[in-house]
Amino acid sequence: YTFEPTGESIPYAIFVPSSYDPKGTEALPLLVSLHGLGRSYDWLMGYHGLLDQAEESGYAVVTPLGYIREGWFGSRPAEDPQDGVYSEQDVMNVLELVRDELRIDSDRIFLWGHSMGGGGTYHIAAKHPDVFAGLGVAAPAPAISAPMDEILDKIAHLPIFILQGDQDDLVPVFATRTWVAGMAARGMQHLYVEIEGGDHSLLISQDAANMQKFVDFFNIVGQK
């Protein structure tokens, strides 16, 4: 699509389950999925189990670029500060495009991300706290766009699933434990799974069982 602030063409990828009938009435739940630093817009589509599980549970999946590969979705300063603003804006633009194109259940829009995308999940949910029904983060690079307490206060009403490996060499496990402690202190509905021996990337990108944990969590919190 054309990104209006710059006139650039920005890609995104979308998966639609085979159960969706364009002429029907049933609305789809949606997984807005945010990639890690330096990855392409469709990188998450290759994560083991994601599309199979989305097909089985009837989810649409969309993977925005975030304007550039290193935009941090606004959660941290990009090399050009304007890129961070555009990175967040691209995600919200793509969400609206999908909602215009498909029948999306507004009560079952979930936001999740891996690494940089985890930080982006924290940031975007805090900026748009009434859009999403639940959150998920895997090995999340802590958002620094605002103090942790300020971000958690804004998302305290949202259920969140957190996946972290204790041998992560990019996002130290203690950093994620600190955020989880903040969630617990607020009485947030959260589920924290710490993987013994888990690394930064393969614990989610190449592990369908861990990917299933996210989908299962969203299935539960999205029940009507």
Predicted features and spans:
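Short beta-to-alpha linker loops that shape the active-site pocket of alpha/beta-hydrolase fold enzymes
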Residues: 18, 37, 65-68, 141, ...
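C-terminal catalytic histidine-bearing segment of alpha/beta-hydrolase fold enzymes
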Residues: 161-163, 169-224
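Serine-hydrolase catalytic machinery in alpha/beta-hydrolase-like enzymes
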Residues: 9-11, 27-103
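Soluble non-cytosolic domains of exported or imported proteins
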Residues: 25-28, 44, 81-89, 126, ...
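Primarily recognizes the serine-hydrolase "nucleophile elbow" in alpha/beta-hydrolase
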Residues: 46, 99-100, 107-154
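The conserved beta1-alpha1 loop
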Residues: 32-36, 139, 164
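Short, proline-enriched alpha-helix->beta-strand connector loops that line the catalytic pocket
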Residues: 155-160
